[in-house]
Amino acid sequence: MRGRLGALVVVALFTTALPAGAARNPGLPNARLTPGATNPAVRQATIHSTICVPGYSSSVRPSESYTERLKFAQLDGGYNLRGDTRASHYEEDHLIPLEVGGSPTAVANLWPEPRTIFWGAARKDRLENALHRLVCDGRVSLATAQRVFSVDWIAGYRRYVGP
């Protein structure tokens, strides 16, 4: 797995150059490098046996060694905020969260999300929790929640959490 992860990271980082200002907002990932990916086992029909079961996210979360290796490779490869490669300033995060059926290990769904900016990891975590509740309560469809994250989670925050 380690060799495969390294190969995927190299392909993802070096076949697509990261142009300056590629993200519309520094809190959003580069859509070409991180388009998002879903877990095929999670569908609208299975939410009550998957994501809505307490402990689901923990049961599918990849190991810290996997995500840390990926984070360092991405930061070193240029996927960072204005040249800041300090790992502590980032959380390797799932663009489409596990809580709404995001793929646990797909490189296309993982990115070094900044912690030190206004639209950073803490705000996205609030949206993840809010949409998870709405999906499990049947007030938002799974597909809608996944789309919020893959298109523009900041706009989703403003709509579902507040200003």
Regions found by a protein language model. Name each.
Residues 2-91, 99-163:
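Nuclease and nuclease-like effector domains acting on nucleic acids or nucleotide cofactors
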